[in-house]
Amino acid sequence: DEMCGDYAKASLGRHIAMVLQDPYLFTGTIFENIQYRTCTADRNDIERAARTVGAHDFIAGLPDGYDTLLEQQGRNLSLGQRQLLSFARALVADAKILILDEATANIDSYTERQIQIALARLLEGRTGIVIAHRLATVRGADRIVVLQDGRIVETGTHAALIEASGLYARLYALNYASFDDIPGDLLQRVTGDKART
């Protein structure tokens, strides 16, 4: 076992990629924005990453495809499209650790579903640290840590936390009460509702 402090910050940085709630995109082409973390990625690498995370179709549909010039912060794209570019960038960077900070916040349900699929592909074979209020984002995690007022109040898998009927189960039931993985009696206990929708 080695301590993180034994590594130089630059060395650690090469192994970590971040996808933020509001992705950083710069004025430049889509190709350049995806290639940002690695100069060695060629057109095939960029397109493969975009296909993997589900961004290729929207990129190919743009008049200049991967050569489309982005405005500052990617203002000429939707938030969901910017997120997908950020996922493609993280995939091309081939980092071992991914930090996803509210990566699905402020997007519609359809786009969230696309991004959930992209997230699953992006996290394959990597360690992911996912900071989320949308609990569907962490549902498949090996370990969920629930914080309240800066303190850890629960840890476990989705199934274990639902069964425990604690804070996670209450939040999940309030947001996703129609999902089949919440037993009716649990839904009633955590929400106080007698009727199931």
Model-derived regions, located:
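Conserved catalytic loops of ABC-family nucleotide-binding domains
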Residues: R121-V130, V138
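ABC ATPase NBD Q-loop/coupling interface
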Residues: D1-S11, R113
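ABC-family nucleotide-binding domains
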Residues: D101, D108
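Conserved signature/switch motifs of ABC ATPase nucleotide-binding domains
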Residues: A93, L100, E124
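ABC ATPase nucleotide-binding domain helical subdomain, centered on the C-loop/LSGGQ "ABC signature"
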Residues: D6, F31-Q72, A120, G125, ...
